[in-house]
Structures are given as structure tokens and as C-alpha cells.
Amino acid sequence: MLGFLGPNGAGKSTSMKMITGYLRPTSGTALINGIDICLEPLRAQQSMGYLPEGAPAWPDMTPRQFLDFVTRIRGLDKAAARSAAHRAIDMTELHGVLDQPIDTLSKGFRRRVGLAQAIVHDPDILIMDEPTDGLDPNQKHQVRAAIREMARTKAIIISTHILEEVDAICTRAMIIDRGRVIVEGT
């Protein structure tokens, strides 16, 4: 599990957008499971889950409706979608808020809805931008535990400007500043 560290404005979120194919780099590329993200972004994105900094969600939908929508656009049949949504809900502990409109949820629960959409299709690769941003201490502990559990079977990259976050859950770290790698290691 790689922790992508750097101060605010270092280029972490921009780099994450390029790795996931949502922003085309001016030069270079990234290979996702051997697939060039610049040449075949949709194919590469099939094997990854992405939690952007401001996780997309329709505010008038409930978490249940949103996850149903995400499983449909991911092409899961009804039985697989139900099972996938149940697994994502369990992992993100959303049971108590499933039928509340997303715009009424706390920032922490909205963040968990974003995480649930990133993992609902059980991707091989998980890329998360500030995954514990806005979470209270208990929620941070729960989400960190879930991330550690997922890291047993997935390649994971998280970005943060908080060293404690990387220290708590990552096995490797990369520090960038102004879009350039400063140091990398364990």
C-alpha cells in the first residue's frame, strides 16, 4: 500500500486524476494492470476504484440509491449488484444512513458513501484521495481498518498531506512537491 504524501498544492490530487485517467498528462503515461491509461482509459478504469477528493454523489439520492446506480453503470446484474452493494455497505458501515438523502449526511458519512462507490465493484486497484478527510477519530479508525483489510488483496494508493495517515496504514511512501517526486521508500 503506497502513501502519496506532500504539502497542500504539491500535485497529489492532480497526479491521482492522471493515474485514474480523469486528467490527461501533458507528457508520459501510467500503466494500470498493463493497460495504458492514456490510450484505453475506460478499459483501465474497469479494474480500479477511485475515491476522489470531493467524492461524486447526487445529493438528492440516498446512499442505497446511489450504490444501486453505480452498480448499474458498472454493468453488474441484479444479484451481483445486491451482493456487491451489501459488501460495500458492510465495509463502510453505512447501515444507519442508507435511506437518508446524501445531502443531509455529515461529511464523514458522505466520505464513506464515496468509499463505498469506489469499492462496490471489487476492483483490483484502489486509488483514494484523502480517504479519511472529514472523519471523526472513530470513523478514521474504522476506515483505516477497512483499508488495511482490503490491502491484503488489492493494490492501494492513498494521497494525503498527513504523515500520521501514511504511518498508520501504508507500507511504502512517496513524497512529492510541485509535481515532482522528492523521496520514495519504506
Regions found by a protein language model. Name each.
Residues 1-177, 182-183:
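ABC transporter nucleotide-binding domains
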